[in-house]
Amino acid sequence: MTESGSVTGSRSVPVLARGPRAWTAWAAGVWSLAFGAAGVHWAAGGAGFPFGAADPRAVQVGSLFAEAEPGSTGPAIAALGLLGVAVALVMARSAGARLPLVFAWAMSVGLVVAVPDVRVIQNFGYLFAGYTGLWDGPLLFMLFCIGGGALWAAAAWTYQGGGAREPVRWGTPVTYAAALLALPYGISRISWAMGIPLGVQPEMLAGGNATGGSVVEAVLGGLCVAGAILTLGLVQRWGEVFPRWMPLLRGRRVPIGLAVVPALCASAMLVQSGARLYLWVAKGDIVLKADGWGSFGPGLAWLPWGLALAAATYAYYLRRRAE
């Protein structure tokens, strides 16, 4: 089939076109179909609605959908899912139109940043401590939405033909900035694990450590420190070639995706959670005091940390792709 121009300036291709642009669009469309079907189910009174009164922790964690009701939110989800299917079909068949690209990026940001809340990063950290007691339906729906956001980001990325082609000069400084921004939260939690009441009253720390909180704090702090070290790998030789002390892998090239995918996942969690903290500060829900700043103060580094990590990952991707 030959390509032909359209009113929008896009290029028509076969419906079953192959290649990254086509299959990422189809994947986003299939996800949107499932998303819309869930909306229809909830609008019809089906069980499992993940927002509002069905989510007992929604208000506590500052969910943007704490007041949502299935009768109004269900149809909205159904309509958005249907629109997503239609846009995905357009993206799979043509390239160059602006509106589908804007929709795809808006869907990605909304699904990754707006729908999830701090429970995602909270349960990610607790998972390393072996605790899964807070897993529930709303959390699973958040993860489902994050997956959908990733699919829409991939569809948008391939639809626009990728990003810049040349390595950027700011990659190294922004990578070091991301590594440094990982430390405030890590230092505070490691201090708590060691019994040092950094930024909190000793009574609060003693109560938490008596119930095993020191183990959790050590894990959370250790994750931050490990994240800082791994971030440095984005500009170090061992981030491109496996070091000698790694059996079977030594000397082999590090797959780009092995560094990029986990870093982007971490960045998404940090941005979505960090944005919530700033929203709470703006609303006056969080007030930093001299004897209690350690509870939330270090978390204010999450948003800039996540943004810097995303930028550092992008710079790494461009540098490795140019090899």
Regions found by a protein language model. Name each.
Residues P184, G213-A228, L232-G239, V254-A308, ...:
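Hydrophobic multi-pass inner-membrane translocation pores used for secretion
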